[in-house]
């Protein structure tokens, strides 16, 4: 079997040296992706296309599907490559190939020709089209909007009978641009923005700020691995996980409520910039869209950018949510994003939409930056190829209950402000308050002879914190969902 890879048009308008470099990189990317399917596969580059030849017919559909997901490819032609002698020979071979497809259909013939011949492309179109029209009684020629277009390519003494055309994702080959670090949360926005930078030729590494324990990290790892495996597996990339719970805890304890959102984002950019510098990455990528949430106004985005010299790319800045969700659906991350948890303890009640730099800096003076330095230093860096094995490991389960026993205590893990605004009162059981960001250091001080039922508004943070405590060896925790 043989496939002809057509280049993304923007590649073809580059200078000769740049075009050759892009084609060489794309050829290498194709080899890297396809070598797992067929070791005998050959990839040959030409000036205006790339040939892929393989012997294992059983892998035809798999190879074709993989090619449609490699950045830099405009479309793929599945062809049968045969020799020919003259125009009548071309017609006879086309008749054998297309007779069944044209039965009862309208059609036209389109020919591309390279090399020296005593006929033109139009001559072949007329001759083959006329012959097919005569020999297939139910077929009819229609030059505009036909049911079937018969595609032929003539190259020197070879005829390419095109059996199918399949669209690629376009863009530039990965590796033609410099590396970037995507701040991935597992939601709609960060997945789509990561894909867009891969499609533009960047090798995308991933940085995840963990706010909710192992279960949340496993979910985000699955999204990152899916994106890499589907669109970027030609290159090795990193997945860096930073435990940001201590940072969130410090913010919730010391920072004014209205400034929390912007300061949290500034801390994330600071941390990601340190990671990017450590690994020689040139830019950060976020899924922020203008005006989508309070921290994404122009004023707030400028203040967020101010904390780092690292370039921050926002490919979705002008996109609305519906467009982003549609893109997530197209690339296959929608289902991941819909099931990704939101956090009930990390959101300000009255966030500012127009932060003032002097106020932000004054609030940040209360923050202990040694905490930020420590979480970055302890960041977990893994090769994304190892994620499939790691995420396959069993996650500790935690029991969810809707009633309680005589030895149980409800543990309200919401932030202090939330608890003051809406105190939790349940008849027949004690309620103890301990904000989630203090659980890692204070839970051990509680009476370990009691069973603690963790509770929060949405039930997401309580489950994740219960999982975290179970992983730390505490067996006396459950999730309370009345």
Curated annotation (Swiss-Prot):
Q: Which residues form the Rhodanese domain?
A: 404-482
Keyword line? ATP-binding, Cytoplasm, Disulfide bond, Nucleotide-binding, Redox-active center, RNA-binding, Thiamine biosynthesis, Transferase, tRNA-binding
Q: Where in the cell is it found?
A: Cytoplasm
The UniProt entry, under Pfam families, shows: ThiI, ThiI_fer, THUMP
Per the record, what are the reactions this protein catalyses?
[ThiI sulfur-carrier protein]-S-sulfanyl-L-cysteine + a uridine in tRNA + 2 reduced [2Fe-2S]-[ferredoxin] + ATP + H(+) = [ThiI sulfur-carrier protein]-L-cysteine + a 4-thiouridine in tRNA + 2 oxidized [2Fe-2S]-[ferredoxin] + AMP + diphosphate; [ThiS sulfur-carrier protein]-C-terminal Gly-Gly-AMP + S-sulfanyl-L-cysteinyl-[cysteine desulfurase] + AH2 = [ThiS sulfur-carrier protein]-C-terminal-Gly-aminoethanethioate + L-cysteinyl-[cysteine desulfurase] + A + AMP + 2 H(+)
Is Isomerase one of the keywords?
A: no
Residues binding ATP are: 183-184, 265, 287, 296
Question: What InterPro entries does the record tag this protein with?
Answer: Rhodanese-like_dom, Rhodanese-like_dom_sf, Rossmann-like_a/b/a_fold, ThiI_AANH, ThiI_fer, ThiI_N, THII_Thiazole_biosynth_dom, THUMP_dom
Q: Got any disulfides in this one, which pairs?
A: 344-456
The pathway that the record names for this protein is: Cofactor biosynthesis; thiamine diphosphate biosynthesis
MF terms in GO:
ATP binding; CCA tRNA nucleotidyltransferase activity; tRNA binding; tRNA-uracil-4 sulfurtransferase activity
Q: Top-level EC class, please? A: transferase
Q: For this UniProt entry, what's an example GO CC term?
A: cytosol
Q: What is its EC number?
A: 2.8.1.4
The active site annotation covers 456 (cysteine persulfide intermediate)
Single biological process term from Gene Ontology = thiamine biosynthetic process
The entry sums up its family as follows: Belongs to the ThiI family.
Q: Spell out the subunit comment.
A: Interacts with IscS.
The free-text function statement in the UniProt record for this protein reads: Catalyzes the ATP-dependent transfer of a sulfur to tRNA to produce 4-thiouridine in position 8 of tRNAs, which functions as a near-UV photosensor. Also catalyzes the transfer of sulfur to the sulfur carrier protein ThiS, forming ThiS-thiocarboxylate. This is a step in the synthesis of thiazole, in the thiamine biosynthesis pathway. The sulfur is donated as persulfide by IscS.
- What this protein is called in its record is tRNA sulfurtransferase
Native species of this protein? Answer: Escherichia coli O157:H7
